[in-house]
Amino acid sequence: SKGRAAIVCFPGIFYRGGAEQKIRKYLVDNNFVETVISLAPNLFFGTSIAVNILVLSKHKTDNKTQFVDASGADFYKKETNNNVLTEKHIEEIMKIFDTKEDIPHVAKCIEYEAIVDNDYNLSVSSYVEAKDTREIIDINELNKEIKTTVAKIDKLRTEIDEIIEVIEG
């Protein structure tokens, strides 16, 4: 009546249809899904695929589900052939799990209705927005650089034309 289970799963079970969707529907409708944690790829020997931890609970006090993206570089250490979860990484993930706080790009608690509206999809990426790591470009600065480069090219073309004229002269 007060049990909790943590199950290591491959990501596909969290979004595929068919029997897997029916199982997710049962777990969500009965308020058993406490947390879904996505981990970095290449953590387990023999597979480079990323895995998730599905935490089920029989004693939840609300109908929200927590989603945690622990796949970023802050949550593992790169070693020769594998990625490794250190004690520090595990403590950080557990702290996020325990507090159930929303952390931008890392953790978010989602209401039951939102999961139902999303066809019982339990993929972390559906609810936790990935951090935008693209370079921010100042368009005005870029236009200045292009203008300078074009001017240099024009100057070089003029110099080349003058050299060719002297050679052919």
What do the PLM-derived regions correspond to, one by one?
Residues S1-G169:
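A conserved structural/catalytic subdomain of Rossmann-like adenosyl-cofactor enzymes
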